[in-house]
């Protein structure tokens, strides 16, 4: 199946602690159906001191399931479903079903 959400896409969180917030996809993990989104699903990690790193509590992004994400419409920034269509020149592109705008290329 083709990827509806890709690295670099602007997405909106549909469910969970960060519902309604948006961010940029940093990484997609297709085998796990999860994605890493900048500024979303922040967790605190307690780091023990090592020779290379100081001890402390660090905040970082955790992965979020793809079913809890929707692509942001390029026109208005709201959540939209994604469709695929083939253009006249033969390229297969993603488009926002809400507005009909082409997302890539």
UniProtKB/Swiss-Prot annotation:
Pfam family, one: KOW
Cellular component per GO, a single term: ribosome
InterPro entries documented for this protein: KOW (IPR005824), Rib_uL2_dom2 (IPR014722), Ribosomal_uL24 (IPR003256), Ribosomal_uL24_CS (IPR005825), Ribosomal_uL24_KOW (IPR041988), Translation_prot_SH3-like_sf (IPR008991)
GO MF term list: rRNA binding; structural constituent of ribosome
Gene3D superfamilies on file: 2.30.30.30
Highest rank taxon of the organism: Bacteria
SMART domains: KOW (SM00739)
Gene Ontology terms describing biological process: translation
N-terminal signal peptide: none
Keywords of the record: Ribonucleoprotein, Ribosomal protein, RNA-binding, rRNA-binding
Main function: One of two assembly initiator proteins, it binds directly to the 5'-end of the 23S rRNA, where it nucleates assembly of the 50S subunit.
Protein family according to the UniProt entry: Belongs to the universal ribosomal protein uL24 family.
Subunit structure: Part of the 50S ribosomal subunit.
Name the UniProt record assigns to this protein: Large ribosomal subunit protein uL24
Annotated source species: Beijerinckia indica subsp. indica (strain ATCC 9039 / DSM 1715 / NCIMB 8712)
